[in-house]
Each structure stands twice: as C-alpha cells, then as structure tokens.
C-alpha cells in the first residue's frame, strides 16, 4: 500500500502495520458472512457479539443480510408479550439458578435486549439478575450507525419516501402501545413463515424498517437511562452483567459508560438525520453528562487511568481494591467516535467537512463545545487518554505486546470457578485487544497498533492467536471457540477504521 504520508515520523511502523492489516483483512474475509453468532460451539446469537459482527458485515457491503439481522434482533426486544425469557444463571444473588421471567419481571426489563437469543429453542436469556448494559447499548450503537451511514451515503432518502410507509407510529404512541403492538409484530420463537412477508416489505421499503426499529431503540434508551440508579450520570451494573460474565464485577464500570455514550451519540446522529432534532439534542446532553461524570468520578489521578468503582457484596459498599482493566479502552473509543454528527469527538473537532452533515447537527456540536456545564476541557481529556494508554501498556501488557484483560488475578469468580490464566481470569483476549488497538489508533499511536497486530498474527504458533476466543498468557495456547468470529470482526473493524481515518 502506497502511503501518501510517507514523510511523517513513524513511517516504518505505519508501513508494517498497513502490510499486516491488508493481509489480515484478506485472510479473514472468509469468516465475515457465516452468520451473526460468535462461531464454533456458540450457535445462538449473543447480542453484544452481534453488534461487532454486523458492523464488519456492513463494511463489506452485505447490506441486505445486515438489515434482515437488525430486524430479527430487535424483534426480540423484551416487553410484555408471550416471549419466553429466563434470567439469573450468572447472578450470585440468585444462587446462579435459572429463573423464568413473569410479567412483573418483563415489565422491569422492558426495552432491554437479551444477552442471548436461542432462536432454535424459542427462548431468550438474560444472563444476570438484570439485562446487561453493554448488550443493549452496543446494539443501539451499531444499529444507529448502520442506518445513519445507510442514509447519509445516499443509499436511501428517508424523508422523501416517509409518506409511503404504512401508518408510521410516533414515538409517543409506540411507548404507550408497546405491549400490544409487540404481540402483532413478534413471535415467541424464531421468525416464522407468517412474519417473513413483513420482513420482505421492510427490505423493499427501508422507511418501514426505520419505523420498526427506531421507536424500539427509544424504549431501549429509556431502559439504559434507568440504570443510573442514583442519578449521578453513571450507569450501574450488577454482578456478571457485562462481557466478563464470570468476573463478578458490579458497580460503576467504565466499559458500561463507554457503551452507553456510544449508544447515545450514534442514535443522536441517526435521529438528527431523520428530523428528530429535539430528541437528538436530549441524547447529546445525556451523553455529555456521562462524560462529565466519568471524568469526575472514574478518573484516578493516582493510577493515571480510568478505573471502575466496584461494589463489594449486596450492600452496595465500594471495593477497596481498584483494578485496571483493558476494557476501559472502549471509553477512549467512545469519546473519539467519528460519527457524522460528531457531538462528542475530540479527534475530529472542527475537521469534519462532509457535505452530508446537516446544519442542525452542526449547531448541536457548537452547543456542546460551548456548554458552560462542561467541567473538563477537551485538552484535559486528551491528556488523560494518553496517560491511560500509557498505564495500560505499563501495567497490563505482558511479554511484549500481549495485554491481559485484568492487571491482577481475580480473587473470586462465578458461576464458573476459574483457575489462574483461564477464561476471564488474567488472560489475553483478541477481541478486546482489537478495541485497544482502535483506541490507540485514535491517538495516532501507530507503533503500538503495529505491536498489537504483530502479536495477534505471529506466525510461530500453530494457529493465528487472533482466531481464538482467549489465550493463556503463560503457555501461549489459544482456547475457547475457534474461529471466534467476534474477535475476528472486532479486529477487522479496528483495522478498517484506522486505515480509513488515516487516509481520509
């Protein structure tokens, strides 16, 4: 690949990175379109995993199948219909026992997406005591980003053809009618032959798809906002209600805030595109409030990084030990996200020259920049991001460029009692390393991106480490699902973002 910026410092790192990235993208293309399940023995749909896989599929141009999958997943949003939902298998408060959700529980969960959709069995599972924040937030983010990109690319003009959509339902009406409406558009198991005609019409008329999904994402946002239990701007999760679902992590988790910021920012951009400026503006303010809260409460000057505030026990007391985790890197991705609305982005401030950006969206960004409630400047956040990346490298990277998901071994795990260097206990996970690589690229740390990609694709192993679910850092042996398409797609997404942003 010829580099038009060849005279910049770090040319060799960048050139090597481009070569490795090109090879990885070419070698992994065969895995992109094998479904939205994570792969191997994971035959069902994990919502958080699907969020990354669908982005990768959309980037390769598989628009039709991606839109079908979005419809399918949002048809499983939790409400008061007859859908079978189980929960609690990962909750210590429920003794790690499966519970069947009754109408009262469904009402509590309403708006969230399940952790897993077992489509063949006709059952959805919420793994913890409550729906995990990241599954719902990441799918809101991905869905919004795909539809927003679809519209802004001129593939379809929403506003021009909206009148042709059959009886579009307003947001307020949908919220009032959610339980009854869902019985009409959704089944308790997989989409059957009766629902397929609607799906076909959705793909022929994208306005119908948008009118089906967007109101559901509004309800999802209401659910996510309700997870800020003490109204301090930070969402709280219970035990095992995130991707590390054996680590017994609960509290105000940086990774959750990042997922929520991504959801709010990307959905705001989509709403802006379809003319819902007021709601878009509210979402922007909500995202900004969370950024301010993260900077105020989750930044540790002593650690030089963003650190979770974890709860110890069911009484809600904070754990004394503060542990750095690799997934805080998602926060750095969230605050540098290059949506065309660009409400929160540090990296692209004042540099987005796209002619597709509406004047109203530009005004949102102007208001965000000049909002007197901002407590921390962009410059300070940039400095903190750089310190966080350096701290991760110092405290989490082992044996060169092999970052572990936690800086220490976990004191307790459950329901799976993990040995040291097993699964979520102090191990190397390619998928979250892809997120860290993306975060480093956002701050032009291309040499470190090259180091990480080199480790993921080293040839002195029987199989490329990037293809495994997780890796034992002591033995260097890959384990779990293989090939693990969540990891492959996340790395591909990071590489594509890095290459496109560098050359744009």
Question: For each of these PLM feature ranges, what is it?
Answer:
Residues 3-45, 79-130, 164, 226-251, ...:
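Extended glycan-interaction surfaces of carbohydrate-active proteins
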């Amino acid at each position: 690949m010829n580099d038009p910026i060849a005279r910049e410092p770090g040319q060799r790192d960048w050139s090597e990175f481009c070569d490795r990235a090109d090879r990885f993208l070419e070698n992994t293309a065969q895995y992109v379109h094998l479904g939205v399940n994570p792969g191997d023995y994971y035959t069902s749909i994990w919502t958080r995993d699907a969020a990354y896989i669908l982005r990768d599929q959309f980037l390769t141009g598989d628009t039709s199948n991606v839109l079908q999958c979005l419809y399918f997943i949002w048809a499983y949003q939790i409400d008061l219909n007859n859908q079978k939902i189980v929960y609690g298998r990962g909750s210590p408060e429920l003794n790690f026992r499966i519970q069947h959700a009754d109408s009262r529980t469904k009402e509590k969960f309403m708006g969230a997406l399940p952790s897993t959709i077992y489509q063949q069995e006709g059952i959805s599972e919420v793994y913890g005591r409550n729906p995990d924040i990241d599954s719902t937030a990441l799918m809101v983010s991905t869905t919004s980003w795909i539809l927003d990109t679809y519209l802004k690319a001129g593939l379809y003009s929403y506003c021009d053809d909206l009148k042709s959509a059959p009886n579009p339902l307003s947001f307020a009406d949908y919220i009032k009618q959610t339980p009854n409406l869902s019985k009409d558009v959704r089944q308790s198991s997989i989409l059957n032959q009766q629902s397929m005609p609607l799906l076909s019409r959705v793909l022929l008329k994208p306005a119908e798809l948008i009118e089906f999904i967007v109101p559901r994402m509004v309800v999802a946002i209401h659910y996510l906002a309700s997870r800020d239990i003490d109204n301090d701007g930070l969402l709280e999760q219970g035990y095992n209600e995130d991707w590390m679902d054996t680590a017994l992590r609960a509290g105000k988790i940086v990774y959750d805030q990042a997922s929520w910021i991504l959801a709010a920012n990307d959905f705001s951009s989509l709403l802006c595109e379809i003319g819902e400026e007021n709601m878009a503006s509210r979402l922007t303010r909500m995202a900004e409030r969370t950024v301010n809260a993260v900077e105020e409460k989750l930044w540790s000057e002593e650690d030089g990084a963003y650190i979770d505030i974890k709860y110890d026990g069911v009484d809600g007391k904070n754990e004394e030990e503060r542990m750095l985790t690799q997934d805080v890197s998602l926060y750095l991705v969230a605050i540098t996200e290059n949506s065309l609305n660009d409400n929160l982005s540090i990296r692209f401030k004042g540099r987005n020259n796209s002619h597709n950006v509406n004047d109203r969206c530009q005004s949102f960004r102007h208001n965000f920049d000049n909002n007197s409630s901002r407590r921390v400047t962009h410059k300070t956040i940039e400095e903190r991001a750089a310190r966080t990346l350096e701290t991760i490298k110092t405290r989490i990277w082992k044996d060169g460029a092999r970052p572990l998901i936690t800086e220490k071994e976990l004191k307790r795990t459950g329901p799976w009692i993990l040995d040291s260097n097993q699964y979520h206990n102090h191990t190397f996970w390619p998928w979250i390393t892809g997120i860290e690589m993306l975060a480093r690229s956002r701050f032009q740390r291309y040499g470190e991106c090259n180091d990480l990609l080199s480790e993921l694709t080293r040839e002195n192993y029987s199989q490329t480490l990037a293809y495994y679910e997780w890796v034992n850092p002591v033995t260097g042996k890959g384990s779990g699902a293989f090939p693990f398409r969540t990891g492959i797609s996340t790395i591909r997404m990071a590489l594509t973002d890095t290459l496109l942003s560098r050359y744009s």
